[in-house]
A protein has these predicted regions:
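N-terminal cap/lid segment of alpha/beta-hydrolase-fold proteins
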Residues: 1-27
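Cap/lid segment of the alpha/beta-hydrolase catalytic domain
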Residues: 23-24, 29-125, 129, 170-180
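Structural recognition of the beta-strand scaffold that forms the well-ordered cores
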Residues: 27-30, 81-83, 140, 163-167, ...
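Alpha/beta-hydrolase-fold serine-hydrolase catalytic core, especially in secreted/extracellular enzymes
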Residues: 1-10, 203-303
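Alpha/beta-hydrolase fold nucleophile elbow
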Residues: 133-145
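The feature captures the conserved acid-bearing segment of alpha/beta-hydrolase catalytic domains
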Residues: 163, 172-228
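Conserved hydrolase catalytic core segment
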Residues: 156-163
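Glycine-rich nucleophile elbow surrounding the catalytic serine of serine-hydrolase chemistry
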Residues: 143-154
Length: 303
């Protein structure tokens, strides 16, 4: 799938649709972080063994492509899933990551990499809502690392979300996670709490988020309590390095099962699937080339 979020700037990604489902279906947006090759992540056999030996993953298929594992199971649970590219990753290559909006003129005009990605996410919501089978009242988003940052940003910018799941949210380590004036006098915990009372789950890892259960979650619960929504905020620490592995995904499956009313038997377990090789995931090929009007950062800035 690809569509223009701005004239000459295209959002690309894969659309997963469940089979044999009637009626209106929930939709889940899946932004991703700085994984090697982005949407096309394809781990080596040695990396797969490491993931399984550490307990982070159970199956070679999910270890090979944990991003596909997430999308495949959500589709099996009855969700329409849009797994879309961050700017400069996957098929979105006209603007190099993380360049493009670091010049003085862009900053003075509050044009930023993060702003463009967030606009892409808003337009991704528009896209899934244009699908006739999607239930407009059951739209969710989930991502890890800078995909978690993008998840928070979308929840702040768009009120159409019914549930939010953040895994290892970043304070900001790249221009795609920082915009001018974004965190002046505040932080990610406070920003994430602004989506209350929308249901929100947070998975923390053995990284800069490892103390979230004691520093972050209590404060977010206090905000949710003001709305009488204590049962809509969850947080859990998993003792693994920065990731969106099986354990974080299982928390997410259960969270969406509850708040999107999927009706899936608990506990939700991943089922075997065959990951699709990167070449087949690509939106563009000889028969379907990149649109001729696709522009770079300068073109987006001019617009």
């Amino acid at each position: 799938v690809f569509f223009a979020s701005l004239p000459g700037h295209y959002v690309s990604g894969n659309l997963y649709r469940p089979k044999g489902r009637a009626g209106k279906l929930p939709a889940v947006l899946c932004p991703y972080g700085h994984w090697p090759d982005g949407r096309f992540i394809w781990r080596t056999d040695a990396e797969i063994r490491g993931e399984i030996d550490s307990g982070a993953e159970k199956t070679p298929q999910a270890a090979r492509s944990p991003l596909q594992a997430r999308c495949a199971l959500l589709a099996r649970m009855g969700c329409v899933v849009f797994h879309y590219d961050m700017v400069g990753y996957g098929d979105s290559r006209k603007i190099e990551h993380p360049l493009g909006f670091t010049d003085t003129e862009s900053v003075l005009r509050l044009q930023s990499f993060m702003g463009l990605q967030t606009w892409n996410s808003i337009r991704a919501v528009d896209f899934v809502l244009s699908l006739p089978e999607v239930d407009e009242k059951r739209i969710a988003v989930t991502g890890a690392s800078s995909g978690g940052t993008q998840t928070i940003a979308l929840s702040l910018a768009d009120q159409r979300l019914a549930a939010v799941m953040v895994s290892m949210n970043m304070q900001g380590g790249c221009v795609c996670e920082n915009a001018p004036l974004y965190r002046v006098g505040t932080n990610n915990v406070e920003l994430a709490a602004l989506c209350a009372p929308t249901p929100q789950g947070v998975a923390a890892a053995k990284d800069w988020t490892e103390d979230f259960e004691t520093r972050g979650l209590p404060q977010m619960k206090a905000i949710y309590r003001l709305y009488g929504a204590d049962d809509r905020i969850e947080g859990r620490f998993f003792p693994y390095p920065h990731n969106y592995n099986l354990h974080s995904r299982q928390m997410m499956y259960g969270f969406f099962n509850k708040h999107l009313k999927l009706g899936w038997p608990e506990p939700v377990e991943e089922k075997p699937f065959e990951p699709i090789p990167p070449a087949q995931l690509s939106v563009y090929d000889a028969a379907h080339p990149v649109p001729s009007d696709a522009t770079d950062a300068a073109g987006v800035r001019r617009w």
